[in-house]
Amino acid sequence: MSKLNIIFAGTPEFAAQHLQALLASQHNIVAVYTQPDKPAGRGKKLQASPVKQLALQHNIPVYQPKSLRNPQAQAELNALNGDVMVVVAYGLILPEAVLHIPRYGCLNVHGSLLPRWRGAAPIQRAIWAGDQETGVTIMQMDAGLDTGDMLHKVSTKIEADETSASLYMKLAKLAPPALLAVLDGLTEQQFKPEKQDNQLANYAEKLSKQEAKLDWNLPAYQLAQNIRAFNPWPMSFLTVEVEGVEQHVKVYQATVLAHQYHAVGTVLQVDKNGIQIATSEGVLNITQLQPQGKKPMSVQDFLNGRANWFSLGKKL
């Protein structure tokens, strides 16, 4: 096992947890690449990414180019003499020229069992599609979008109540040891590259706020999957008219019930156990929700003072 000089590229907390694991290893982090500071909070002050904050705590040089396509940025990277570049949720596209700069190329930690769910939102789309399991893939990057050779996979079950938030945390614990195993065996080529089967590939499109609105023409099981997949962002929501004003209500938890046919979007039952709404297939029973300007709450708490919002027979 040889000590490697690693260039790390990542931005969010998920990436920072990988950097933390690398800092605790025998390997040497020669530099960190992360996205430029962005305005955040009510004051819109520039805020450093979690990866940058961690790197500065450990006195690691930080680079924040807006792009890696220009020759100057590539020359800077080349001068670092890295053995390998580790890329985790960086957010910038790496041009092909960059992929060949480090001695062992660029490794990527991807949040799915490739070739399933290539693309921007693999964790969320696995839940959205009703997958029973997912995991992480450590891959050798190439010029395509998550199309490189796979070096190592680790899988985990997707629980029935799993949200993207909980799965994100699960993979953040699962992935760093898998990455370290690959790095520790890199010089001896302990992990043999495996080609991806393009016929099994699908694409994890980015989530949108428009997609988060609950569509009662979808089956109840799909809406329940959406609610879990879109938590913590963009959060599934419904709209309901109350005294002539359209109210937006975020939905945090729901279960699926069977039913005989009813007109879609009809409120069928309202009690402390849930708000039951007819869909094209089955009933969605909403059990936790959040009115605008309030915290998430149980149906029982929601109905205190809002009992008229979801009257029986009301069409949403």
Swiss-Prot record:
Coiled coil: none annotated. Its EC number is 2.1.2.9. It catalyses: L-methionyl-tRNA(fMet) + (6R)-10-formyltetrahydrofolate = N-formyl-L-methionyl-tRNA(fMet) + (6S)-5,6,7,8-tetrahydrofolate + H(+). (6S)-5,6,7,8-tetrahydrofolate binds at residues 112-115. Keywords: Protein biosynthesis, Transferase. One of its GO terms (cellular component) is cytosol. Gene3D superfamilies: Formyl transferase, C-terminal domain, Formyl transferase, N-terminal domain. It holds the Pfam family Formyl_trans_C. One of its GO terms (molecular function) is methionyl-tRNA formyltransferase activity. Belongs to the Fmt family. NCBIfam families: fmt. This is Methionyl-tRNA formyltransferase. It comes from Haemophilus ducreyi (strain 35000HP / ATCC 700724). The gene is fmt.
